[in-house]
């Protein structure tokens, strides 16, 4: 009888452990600590990377990115982890002397340099294209930040599970309505868009049927929305500025 009670108790504990696994896995990355570091170093998207240099708190985050187990995570938990991981490691690359400027610099920064992510040794390019994009969330293109001036701004807060939808919507709206990155001339019916919309057009088309339909969900100007919904804009793409989004 005692052995049966012990067996049932052990089974119950195992079930509780399995149920808690996703939350535990996500908790391996100290998101509040990342938010604190962002608040200390980021102002209106401008990053003072020197605040994270030789910083044991930042180094601890890169270790956590390496050790986190994503096996039990659901889609939303993976989005939170991978978005934060990308932004942490993009900064790590800058601190290690990397740069997205120049063709060679971009190749080294995005493809050659490797990082430990959830038990794998991968590049920023692989992290984006093989781990994040397969989650089918086009708003990630406004959340992951490649340390360049034309990238979306790095926000002064980490992405969290509780606020993920709100944060992604905010990131998309802020980026699309930023006149330095996208402009909509309703009189001439011409749109000058970030090259992000050219490079990843298939992601936006898959989500909304067309690029202009996707943009219409976030654009604030009502006249521009009307034209976008009628696919009436002639679209061109802006030159991408790969200069650093802050200082080392």
Regions found by a protein language model. Give the residues of each.
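Bacterial N-terminal signal peptides that target proteins for export
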Residues: 2-12
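N-terminal signal peptide c-region/cleavage motif recognized by signal peptidases
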Residues: 20-22
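Interaction/scaffold regions that mediate signaling and macromolecular assembly across diverse proteins
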Residues: 26-72, 76-248
């Amino acid at each position: 009888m005692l052995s049966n009670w012990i067996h049932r108790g052990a089974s119950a504990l195992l079930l509780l452990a399995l149920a808690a696994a996703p939350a535990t896995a996500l908790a391996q990355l100290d998101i509040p600590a990342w938010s604190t570091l962002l608040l200390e170093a980021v102002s209106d998207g401008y990053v003072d990377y020197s605040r994270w240099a030789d910083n044991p708190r930042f180094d601890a985050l890169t270790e956590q990115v390496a050790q986190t187990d994503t096996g039990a995570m659901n889609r939303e938990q993976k989005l939170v982890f991978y978005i934060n991981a990308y932004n942490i490691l993009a900064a790590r690359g800058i601190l290690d002397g990397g740069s997205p400027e120049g063709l060679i610099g971009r190749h080294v920064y995005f493809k050659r340099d490797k990082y430990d992510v959830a038990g794998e040794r991968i590049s920023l390019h692989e992290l984006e294209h093989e781990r994040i994009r397969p989650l089918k969330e086009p708003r990630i293109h406004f959340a992951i930040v490649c340390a360049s001036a034309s990238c979306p701004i790095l926000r002064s807060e980490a992405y969290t599970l509780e606020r993920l939808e709100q944060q992604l919507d905010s990131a998309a709206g802020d980026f699309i309505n930023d006149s330095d990155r996208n402009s909509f001339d309703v009189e001439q019916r011409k749109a000058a868009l970030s090259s992000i919309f050219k490079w990843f057009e298939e992601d936006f088309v898959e989500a909304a049927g067309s690029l202009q339909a996707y943009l219409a969900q976030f654009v604030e100007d009502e006249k521009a929305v009307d034209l976008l919904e009628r696919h009436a804009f002639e679209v061109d793409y802006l030159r991408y500025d790969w200069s650093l989004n802050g200082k080392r």
